Amino acid sequence: MSKVGTSDSKNTLYCSFCGKSQHEVRKLIAGPTVFICDECVELCMDIIREENKSSLVKSRDGIPTPKEICKVLDDYVIGQSHAKKVLSVAVHNHYKRLNHQTKHNDVELAKSNILLIGPTGSGKTLLAQTLARILDVPFTMADATTLTEAGYVGEDVENIILKLLQSADYNVERAQRGIVYIDEIDKISRKSDNPSITRDVSGEGVQQALLKIMEGTVASVPPQGGRKHPQQEFLQVDTTNILFICGGAFSGLEKIISARGRSTSIGFAAQVLAPEDRRTGEIFRHVEPEDLLKYGLIPEFVGRLPVVATLEDLDEASLKKILTDPKNALVKQYQRLFEMENIELTFADEALGAVARKAIERKTGARGLRSILESILLETMFDLPGLEGVEEVVISREVVEGTARPLYIYADRSDRTAESSASA
């Protein structure tokens, strides 16, 4: 039990874990010799929930079922039920293959790398990160735009394996069962349909370089990274069992898919739907390998990515959930910032809907939500530290639309006061 010895606060009780006083927390629970505050209790509950999730996915000989994987993905990623199902089945089969490959020699199971296709801000990267976290395997991310063929300025594809090795603390065995996520994979598409006289070192050349490590090869990885230390001893990493997930927005692919759809439907009975009348994510659901070839991926590269998961555009309801539901939701983050000034930040439900609609109009998906909130709250965050007596700030739909200023509630007034009823 923690008490202060000064005469002014000798009766003040303190949390034995975080040291906060009874005046700084909502509740202080007493034990035989200790006190614990409500904040520490919540933290303990979070730790227990995480432990329960890890024990759930480590059941059944270490292979989570697709439903178990999907259930955990639901806790972190809003929407995208189809992509979650595809990923859950693919990852389950991949690790089942690894655990049982030595038991049966009659049938060799091939590796199924995954291609994620979806609009910007739809959750591709978050899905890959969450998968690695719940499976407790080494994980690394690479940006395809920085990769070049060996011998040219830029990163070698072997650097991807080096990053994976580093995330596994140089444990080669663990790294060989890891997950690699390559983002912006659409940016290494072939620059033109016709073979060029000059080498395409950051497009088709990178696709060729990625082929071997994605299918399975023993890569020689320099522990200190690349070309600057030519004399160092190389580590041998077998990439056969590393799961590769490639993601990209594939801007313009929807036009190729729509054009193919129009060419196969002719006559008076053909149902013609203008591309602008269909959302990008809906069109992506009809992607075929031939569309990816036309986009600029080489046939061998498409063949190394047999599992294709398409993500849909996030609708207004999904974006509203993203704003409020996750543990680190944006609204919660800004509310925490305002709490530091002892001010409560409140968003009207219509305001959240207006923010979601703005993100849809800008076609930035979930990634654009922060910039929208930042612009809405900029003036308020600029003014508040210099104002006294403000107890609460209320954001309405009109504030989001730019026709009003935020409402301020002052501690010494019961009515809601606005700095200005309308913006100039």
Curated annotation (Swiss-Prot):
CDD domains registered for this protein in UniProt: RecA-like_ClpX
Protein's UniProt keywords contain Metal-binding: yes
Function: ATP-dependent specificity component of the Clp protease. It directs the protease to specific substrates. Can perform chaperone functions in the absence of ClpP.
Family: Belongs to the ClpX chaperone family.
Positions with a binding annotation for ATP: P119, T120, G121, S122, G123, K124, T125, L126
Biological process annotations from GO: cell division; proteolysis involved in protein catabolic process
Ranges of residues in domain ClpX-type ZB: 3-56
Coiled-coil positions: none
Keywords on record: ATP-binding, Chaperone, Metal-binding, Nucleotide-binding, Zinc
Subunit structure: Component of the ClpX-ClpP complex. Forms a hexameric ring that, in the presence of ATP, binds to fourteen ClpP subunits assembled into a disk-like structure with a central cavity, resembling the structure of eukaryotic proteasomes.
GO cellular component, one term: HslUV protease complex
Domain of life per record: Bacteria
Keyword Oxidoreductase carried by entry: no
Binding site for Zn(2+): C15, C18, C37, C40
Entries under InterPro entries matching the protein: AAA+_ATPase, ATP-dep_Clp_protease_ClpX, ATPase_AAA_core, Clp_ATPase_C, Clp_protease_ATP-bd_su_ClpX, ClpX_bact, P-loop_NTPase, Znf_CppX_C4
GO molecular function, one term: ATP hydrolysis activity
This protein's name: ATP-dependent Clp protease ATP-binding subunit ClpX
A Pfam family it matches: zf-C4_ClpX
Classification via HAMAP family: ClpX
